[in-house]
Amino acid sequence: MPAPASPSIAGLLLAGGRATRMDGVDKGLQLLDGTPLALHVLRRLAPQVDETLISANRHADRYAELGAPFDARIIADETPDFPGPLAGLLAGMRAARAPLVACSPCDTPYLPVDLVARLRAALDAQQAAIAMAVTVDAQQVRSPQPTFALLRTSLADDLAARLAAGDRKVRAWYARHKTVEVEFRDERAFYNANSWQELAALARR
C-alpha cells in the first residue's frame, strides 16, 4: 500500500489570545446562534486545508471536543504570557506537517470559503513567502487583515528570533519577507468580535 500523501496546507485556528476587551473570556468559546465562534470558523476553514491545528492556551479539552470532527490537533504557544498572534503562528508552523500554514482568528464566523485557494494562488504566482488578505470597501479603502494569511513554515526560525527579540507586531514581521496582498470585496467575511457589542452585532449580520 502506498504511503499517504503529505499534507500541503495546514489550517491554523488562532484561539490563544487574552480577549482583554471582553473581560478575559475565551472568545472562541462564546456562542453565536447557539454555536461556539470557533466551531463556526472550523466548519469553514477545515474543508479548505489538509490538516487542522488549533492554537489554544486555555480550555484545551473544550477545543479538542470542537476540533474532533476535523481531526484537529491542539497546540499551545512556545512562549509564555500570551505574547499575541505571532506566538500562535510560530506554534502552528512548528507543529504543521505541511509546508504552508493558513491562519484565521477564532472569532470570524463568516470566513471566506475560498480564502485558502485565493491566498495559495497569489502566493504561487508571486513566489512570495506570505499571502495576506486585504479587504476593499465601496470607497476603495484598503484594510489589511494580517491574521488571515498563508505562510511558508520555513519562516519559523526567523519568527522565533523576532519573538525572542521582543517583536510582537504581525505586519512588521511580514514586512521582513516578500508578502503579497490578496483583495477581498466582501468585508462581512472578515467581521469579528473584539467586544461584547461586536459579538452582538455579529448575530445581526
From Swiss-Prot:
Its main location: cytoplasm. Its EC number is 2.7.7.77. One of its GO terms (molecular function) is GTP binding. It comes from the Bacteria. Its cofactor is Mg(2+). The N-terminal domain determines nucleotide recognition and specific binding, while the C-terminal domain determines the specific binding to the target protein. Belongs to the MobA family. Transfers a GMP moiety from GTP to Mo-molybdopterin (Mo-MPT) cofactor (Moco or molybdenum cofactor) to form Mo-molybdopterin guanine dinucleotide (Mo-MGD) cofactor. Monomer. This is Molybdenum cofactor guanylyltransferase. The lineage of its organism: Bacteria, Pseudomonadati, Pseudomonadota, Betaproteobacteria, Burkholderiales. The gene is mobA.
